[in-house]
Amino acid sequence: IVEIADALNSGLPVSEITFIRGTVCKVRSLDRVPDALVLPTYDELTKDKKQYAASFYKQYCNTDPFTAKQLAEPYGSHLYVIQNPPAYPLTTQEMDDVYELPYMRTYHPSYEALGGVPAISEIKFSLCSNRGCFGGCSFCALTFHQGRIIQTRSHESLIREAKLMTQEKDFKGYIHDVGAPTANFRHPACQKQLTKGVCTGKQCLFPSPCKNLTVDHQDYIQLLRKLRALPKVKKVFIRSGIRFDYVLADKSDAFLKELCQYHVSGQLKVAPEHVSD
């Protein structure tokens, strides 16, 4: 948003702001995006499942901010929809800044006439600890939404938000979740991802954990302990999915023990799409 504002402030017309990462735009010619990968046309997608799959695969292969190319989908006879490469991962400070904006922590009052939003009871007292997921589960679109590179909030930011939760009049002492796309991913899969992006054509955990995978739950354990120790907090649950193959790859069983002892609210939630048995 800041980049768009800067471009407008510099005097560029909207029609020429076609280069900002994480944005999609409409153009009449590919002259200004000569290196774009051309996807099947919109009409082809609506008529042929194989073309749809081919388009999806090209998009899937271009979700990494370090290696992705611009994508162009022909639409009609004179238009192209251009998708720019994803934005680079946010730093921890940027994550903190975004998540600590003065949100209202509830739905818009206009929904009252419809009876409210039932899901608010689950998410109102939940903490989002990070973005991104390198799990690669089948049928999961989170790679498209947030990318494979983990971006993490600081302990201090999460504790500040938890303290604000405890001041809500309907807070009963229970933090429902401290999670993300995958709860127990609190850092990138490896240090390479921060400078060179993710590996093309390879998964971090499938069919077996990569030899370069960093497996460590200590940061998450320490965060959960700090949250459990807060005044007015009775229980801290984890209701985001747990990748249990990542848990089993950890040489220490400390996280598994504390997970079972303190953080399961009746039934452990896992990310099952990476197994077939």
Segments (PLM) and residue ranges:
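Acidic/polar loop patches that form or flank catalytic/metal-binding clefts of enzymes
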Residues: 13-18, 105-110, 148-151, 166-177, ...
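Hydrophobic alpha-helical scaffolding
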Residues: 81-88, 123-130, 144, 148-155, ...
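Conserved SAM/AdoMet-binding glycine-rich loop
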Residues: 164-277
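Short Cys/His-rich local motifs and their 1-3 flanking residues in nucleic-acid-associated proteins
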Residues: 142-145, 180
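N-terminal pre-triad scaffold of radical SAM enzymes
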Residues: 112-141, 174, 267
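Cysteine-centered iron-sulfur cluster-binding motifs in ferredoxin-type domains/subunits
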Residues: 125-138, 148-157, 161, 165, ...
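Flexible, acidic/Gly-rich N-terminal and inter-domain linker regions that tether
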Residues: 1-123
